[in-house]
Amino acid sequence: MSEPSKTRTSFYRRLYVAWLISQGTDTVPAIMEATGMPRRTAQDTLTALAELDISCAFEQTEGARHLQGHYRISDWGPINPAWIKAKLPLIKETLSYP
């Protein structure tokens, strides 16, 4: 298989991070642990979800200190999460994620 394009890997990374959030892997440290991606990449990917019209927001834990909480997907926009679930092995292989 040839090397995947940067466009494909960027798209798949966004889909995979959105999927992880929807499955409860919903903090930057948890995303880093699940994927092995650096903190900055995880943060940039979270920000980039809006470019796919995926609505993702940070929800502060009530009564917790500053920036303690988790991310939540409130709208998948044009993305079908069932497609992501069906293609998880391909997505993870393309991104070299465990």
Predicted segment positions?
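Helix-turn-helix DNA-binding helix
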Residues: A42-Q43
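Residue-level detection of the helix-turn-helix DNA-binding "recognition helix"
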Residues: L46-E51
